[in-house]
Amino acid sequence: MKFLFASDSFKGTLSSRRTAELLTQAAEEIFPGCECAGLEVADGGEGTTEAVLSAVDGRRIPVSVKGPLWEQREVFYGALDENRAVMEMAEASGLPLVPKELRDPRNTTTFGTGEMIRDAIDRGFRDISIAIGGSATNDGGIGCMRALGVRFLDESGQELRGCGADLIKIRTIDCSGLDTRIKERKVRFTVMCDVKNPLCGADGAAYTFGKQKGGTPEMLDELEAGMQNYRDLLLQEFGVNMDEVPGAGAAGGLGAALTAFLNAELKSGIETVLDLIGFEEKLQGVSLVVTGEGRADWQSVFGKVMQGVGSRCQRMGVPAVAIVGSMGTGAEQIFDHGIESIMTTVNGIMPLEEAMERAEELYLGAARRMFRMLRAARGL
């Protein structure tokens, strides 16, 4: 038998790689001589670059960029081959990079994300995938675009630096300096984005995500006014209303900038990851796929790893099952997306803290139970 293991990480306990190692241990105990392969996968959030690089044997590319508070930072993105690159905006512009006492979305910038993109283009990459979760910013992506040559001018014609507080001050957008390789559509951009928020309004970038980035109600009102000004200018420049583009409000409005200036495609994170790693090709000859995540519930069918893996397996006619930490309301919906069965790691009533402390032991036990059940079913 040939097994393929492709589970998401269990937050705070098990990495995607570790789940594959434990599944391999259990499978070899129950099915001696079986063939096992593990894939690190992610849904476009934290760890996406590492997961993709591991799956395709890619390489890290270090680069020095500006952090969210304009400090210099050493970060990395990934090269899959000579043409394709993958990166996380959180590497350069992520919330964990900003100390809690300094969190103010009026001051943070995506400039460093733009520097990563520029570095990738300079190195010859022409197919760039960008994960935009975990941002510290609410600058509408103007910092990122400024790093790529766009100028945002105030009423006196002075160039703005590119942070959230600058949005309300913009009077003119000058795209004449935008990197010609981008202008001439020589670079393809894919943005991993699973939120559908518009740029402005109650569900927009400021009011939906600004609070978690340190924004007070007064700050959010200021940022919303700035976003509305920015939206109107983008409409004038590109003829597109970013309040009508699902995902434009992602990452503090970075989704809008990448769409408008770079002609990027906004796409599900897990779908992008599975495409990058050539998942369907890896299903050839596989008897069973085992996937999973920390908790299965109604949210699992919305762009999560289990849904993505299960749907691909269903399409290719390969059975898939899942091991999860726990199950919540609506978990059974995943059965409509290619997952045949779910096994939980928790084997009795216990506090969450105990379940996390015993994560490896409990996961291995669940894997053994699952493979024993599979062995029994083969004899029917």
Predicted regions and their residues:
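N-terminal loops that bind phosphate or other acidic moieties
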Residues: 1-132, 136-380
